[in-house]
């Protein structure tokens, strides 16, 4: 898996094969559309899907964190898939993952699924904000946001 170095808006970034973007100047790791609990939500709606997708996603995210050593993680929307995300199994996996990365500040820029699913539980210690989230002169959004001309 190869990463790609790019620059946009005067900001250097590393597009990672692990489905993340790393901004080295601010040591920020960006991800989007994590959809924790998606398989649990589908099973709750009687749609057959295998368990374990959240665990796979958490492991990939952990590897990106270990690889980059970020000062913060910013999730650009859709952290949670639906209100039914919070099964015992999913919450236990996410809680254990969060404990592994307890010192890492996490910011969630709410996306369309987050607005329906609600904010993550307080024990996960995730700061939730609306869009846009401004960082290094960039306006970060889940969906296209209005901008100044």
Q: Where would I find each of the regions flagged by the language model?
A:
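Core dinuclear metal-dependent hydrolase active-site scaffold
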Residues: 3-23, 131-149
């Amino acid at each position: 898996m190869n990463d790609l170095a790019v620059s946009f808006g005067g900001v250097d970034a590393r597009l990672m094969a692990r489905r993340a973007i790393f901004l080295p100047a601010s040591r920020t790791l960006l991800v989007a559309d994590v959809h924790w609990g998606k398989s649990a939500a589908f099973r709750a709606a009687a749609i057959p899907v295998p368990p374990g997708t959240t665990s796979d996603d958490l492991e990939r995210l952990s590897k990106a964190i270990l690889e980059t050593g970020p000062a913060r993680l910013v999730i650009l929307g859709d952290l949670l898939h639906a209100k039914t995300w919070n099964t015992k199994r999913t919450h236990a996996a996410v809680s254990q993952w969060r404990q592994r990365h307890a010192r890492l500040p996490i910011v969630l820029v709410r996306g369309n699924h987050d607005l329906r699913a609600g904010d993550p539980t307080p024990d996960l210690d995730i700061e939730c904000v609306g869009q846009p989230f401004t960082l290094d002169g960039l306006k970060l959004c889940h969906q296209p946001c209005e901008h100044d001309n």
